[in-house]
Amino acid sequence: MTNQQHQLAVQEAVKGKFKGKKVIKSRSVPHYPESAEREFKRVTNGYIRLLKKCLMEELPGIMDEYRREQRSDSRFDASLKLAEKVKNALIKVARELEQKLAKYKLNELVRKVAKLTKVNSLNEWKRVCEDTLGIDLLDDYYNGDFYEDALRRWVDENIQKIKSIPNDTLGSMQKIILDGFREGKTITAIQKEIQKEYSVTRRNAQLLARDQIATLNAQISKLQQEDAGCSKYKWSSSKDSRVRDCHRALDGKIFSWDDPPEMWYETKSGRVYTGRHCHPGEDIACRCVAIPVFDIDTVDVPIKSKKS
C-alpha cells in the first residue's frame, strides 16, 4: 500500500467521526506526564544528595582552616592561604562526586526517564486518537527511529545540565566562604549560608526536572501531531493557581504548529512581551499541553483497525 493509499484508507475509516465537518478538535485532553516529572525529580534529588554528602565530608576541614586563618596576624596572607585551601578542597569534592557518579548510573537513569516520558506521551496520544477518531494505532510505528533523535538529544543535554550543577554550586560556596572571611563572619553564619545555597541548588534541580520533562513532552507531542497531519492545536493550561497569566489567556485558543504565540508577562506599567515564541510545554517549567485539531483532508495516522 502506498502512502497515498494508506492516507485514503485512514480518511475513509475516520470520516464518520467528522460528521461532514472539515476539522474536529480532540474529544480528550492529553495529560501532562506527572509520573515522569516525579521520577526525574528523584533522579536530580539523588544527585544533589550525592553532592551534599561529598561536600559534608570536606566542610569540617574547610571550617577548621577558616578558624585558623581568622587568628592569623596578616589578614591578607590568611585570605590567600584560605582561598587556596578552599579551592583545593572543592576540587576534591568535584572529583569524589565524579567517582560516585559512576555508581549512581546517571546516564542510565536519565534514559529511563526519557523512555517513561515517551511511553506516557504515546499512551495519551493513543487515547486521544481512540476517543476522537475511533481507531486503534499501530504500536510498532512509534518504536525505533520515530522518537530516537529527539530522545537522544534530550538525554545528552540533560546529562550535561545535571553534571553542571556542582560547578555552579561549588563556585557559589567558595564565594560564600571567602566573602565571609573578608567580612569577618562567624563559622555559624557561613554554615547557614552554605545550607541556604544547598537549598537553592535543590530547588533549581527540581525546577530543571519540571522544565525538561515539559520540554520533552512538547517535542514528542509536536512530532506525533504533525506526523498525523495536524497543523493546528488548541492550547490547554493546567488550570490551577500556578498557571501564568499569559498561559491562562492562551488557554482554549487555536494556534498553528508553524506559528507559536509570543510569551508575555504583566507589570505595573502594562504588558511586556518577551520576544520568545513557544508552543505548550516549551516555556520555562510550563505544564500546558497541545490538544490536536484533526483535518479530514490531511489526517494520516498509523491505523491498526477501525473500532466497531
Describe each PLM feature range.
Residues 200, 204-306:
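Acidic, glycine-rich two-metal-ion catalytic cores of nucleic acid-processing enzymes
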Residues 1-199, 293-308:
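N-terminal leader/targeting and assembly helices and adjacent pre-domain segments
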